[in-house]
Amino acid sequence: MTNVLDVPERRDRGPAIGPDPRAAAAHVAAGGSPLDLVRAPDWFSYSTLDTFERCPRQYAFRYLCRLPAEQARPAATFGSAAHAAFEAFTRDRRQRSTRGEQPPGRVDLERWFESAWAATSLPAEPEAETWRRRAEPMLDGFWAAESAVHFDTFGEELRFRLRLPLDPETLVVVSGFIDRIDRLPSGTVELIDYKTGQACAPDEAESSLQLSIYALACRDSLGLGRPERATLYFVEQDRRVSVVRTDAALDTVRTDLAARARQIRGSDFAPTPSPRSCGWCDFAALCPINALAAGSPADQTRGAGLDCRDGDSISRWPALPTPL
């Protein structure tokens, strides 16, 4: 079996629809199905499943037409930089430990965060700087918590692939990355997903599909057995919210994932408008619903004259990269 630590650390982007995402977007915006242009998807992740549940049309634009997000948002950039810093810190600590060296210091943690933040395309603006200042207390709290207790970290950014047969001829894959897995004194493991922002209530963690998928991956893909606990680590509050997934619960998750995959593969990708799904949708200007939250980035794009009902709007959509 391949060592999961040796798998290249690359975020999956999903299947490419073809050489011209704009043409695909125009086809979908005009009421056509993306499945007219590409085979039914056989690759899924927690993010794709969550996006489809929020709005099937948004899923089609992002993951089938492969349209990029309009712009980097400070909240997402902050979270990405934090994840990169924590990953670098625990990896370096683990590697130093095998060499009998002292663990990295607080200055190293900040250096990794600054490097990740500088690598983003976020414009220099007051809102971005406000987010940047939030890093200091977060890094202080993470450093203090990680220094107070010995953690035996198995690995970081662990890639998994769950293979799910839908029928004798159809196999789909649910893949992703687990932020961190620690070994526990009991001989089992704890999986950890870092979160920035406000901590959730215990019942929200209990119903988390993301934690269920990751726990299933620990057992069925990574060969680590059922984790003793699955944890959301809210780093800005230094709070951990943990849940337990039984084997029976994980078996149910497998069945549920297969059902979700079938639903997506048979979908017409009709939009499901709501303030949550439309207010910050990068593709609202291409959607016929126009149920947009006032003042949202989507409204600004529509104000610039981009509308799915106008064929010229599609051609004026920003230049798109070639799909991976």
PLM region spans:
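Polybasic (Lys/Arg-rich)
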Residues: 249-282
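Hydrophobic (often cysteine-bearing) scaffold residues that line and stabilize catalytic clefts
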Residues: 74, 78, 82, 131, ...
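Short, polar/flexible loop-turn hinges at active-site or ligand-entry regions and domain interfaces
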Residues: 67-75, 93-100, 124-125, 201, ...
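Short cysteine/histidine-rich zinc-coordinating motifs and their immediately flanking basic loops
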Residues: 290-300
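Mg2+/Mn2+-dependent nuclease catalytic core
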Residues: 158-255
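C-terminal, charged and often intrinsically disordered regions of DNA end-processing helicases
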Residues: 1-77, 297, 303-324
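A non-catalytic, helix-rich entry segment at domain boundaries
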Residues: 84-164, 323
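Short cysteine clusters
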Residues: 55, 278-281, 287
